Amino acid sequence: MLYVTTRNKSDAHTAHKTLTTDRGPCGGFYAPFQMPSFGKSDIEALKGKNFGQCVADILNIFFNARLDGWDVDFSIGRYPCRIVSMSRKVLVAETWHNPDWDFARMVRNLSGCIRGNDEAGGVPSDWAWMSIRIATLFGLFGELLRLGVADTEQPIDIAVTTGDFSAPMAAWYARKMGLPIGNIVFSCNENCAVWDLFHHGQMRTDMIATTTNTPDCDVAIPAALERLIYAQLGADEVKRYLDACTNGLEYRLDDDKLAQLRKGFFSAVVSQKRMESVIHNVYRTSTYLLDPYSALAYGGLQDYRSGSGEGRNALLITERSPACFAETVAKAMGITVQEMKERTRMN
């Protein structure tokens, strides 16, 4: 597969280049020259494959890696992700079942596997991260199809946190490729410049991030937003966006461009105080223990459903175990860290 960048669609780059550098010579993010597309029969066929094979098939398209399901299983284990029913029509995808309790471990291992390394050394590139997120979604949808909670005729919503916008963007790419994804609900913490853009069509580019207890979301301007602007509005709009960022100006979109940019998305803001309340209330009502980031995502999903009346199935993506945030979760629960760890083991 050949790649272009979000700032230059004239020059082509190899898949190998996307694995060794985060950005092209122009500073833009790598993106496929032509995004692969899957029909309904291809999506239905996911049901007959295990998670590892689903992941391998997608990574082979992006990188010609010649992986099979056994390679993926050997790299990340046979059951690195689990789908849990949390409440009515809300399923949780736990993508962190590994020794580190962190999706990043899975990304490192698979990145090394793609590169042909026996060990997961080195830092995964930006496109490696993105492609593995996409491949993971295909693996998860294979499981959802087997469970009978998703099909090609009934989309399922996705709930994630904003962060650097990689998670919402991966869901967008996966939907573009043919997965039956409905709306992509992404939640910000107090750092909500993207919410301003999606709701008001304007965004300050000179903001300084506010420190919270969800630091991965403490981002003033999410880097991967550039990807969405490129995909939805084109390279010329990326240039206008970058000019605003370079000069610390307000970035504005007219009504038509705004409608195009946010099509299929819902943006929410969930404060630190509310995040803690969500952790406490969800455990009280369903005995499911959320980590701080998945609590942000679930709070946004609640806002989306209450505002739209939408009641179809939703998949909440979690990338780290609550045990990784013992103090924050314990505080939200009103218990000691030791008690929280015991509940984590029980779950």
Tell where the protein language model's regions lie, with residue ranges.
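PLP-dependent amino-acid enzyme catalytic core
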Residues: 1-347
